Amino acid sequence: MLSVLVNQVSDKVPFAGGVAQDVAAGTNSTVGAVDVMQTATDVVAEYVKLTGAGRARLVPVSYVDELLANLVAGGASVVEPLSGVPVEVCDIKGRAAAGELLVADERTIGAEFSSACRLGAELAVAEDARVPGYVVVCMRKCCIPWVAEAVEAKACSAENVIVTATGAEEQASARASRHAASDAAQVVAAYLACHPRVGVVRYPGLKTDPSFARATSQLVGGFGPYVDYIWKELPGEWHRFVAGDEDVRKQIINFERLG
């Protein structure tokens, strides 16, 4: 009975993203072949496109906390595209338009889900398995001079960074996993919205969610893995389901067992 309900829900849920997958079966594959001959310069150029930046630099991981602290001291706010409990979409576009200096930390959700610099963030920070030990710091077109100088002071030349032999496949796998988890979360959210014991569900991909309009205009290719909900018998107490990339039926069955 449960599998029938999951299939009915998943059939009605649209999926968006750069991954070809069978969510119910838990399988996924990246679209296109993995380029194993990439250079660090290629990686940087890719993130410029993903985030809508003007340029990007590689910064050693050991310097990232110091860089962010300096930016915050200068008036910047570090935000994540998805944050809070219940989960909501950060209004990067609106806050930037209102004059906030924003640094979008995309290391958790993945830069492929948010074109933060295009939306108005001054910087976007991302991780990539192809360049371990570094973060990719993307700068908005016409970046504020002192912000750009702070980044350049910590940056390394991409020409001096070597892409690891297995990095391209690891990164492709990580992106496929994130997209599969996002698509699974969409099914789980729809399932919980119909659950007799659940009173409230928050997921940016649900049309009834307060963040839905913002999510559809500011996120790309999916709505993330986080689904927050409240049991009817425990009003006011939020719980979180973090979707994975495995068979969504198994995820729901495990949820029911634990719930």
Segments predicted by a language model, with ranges:
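Conserved small-domain helix->loop->beta segment predominantly found in fold-type I
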Residues: E170, R178, Q186-D247
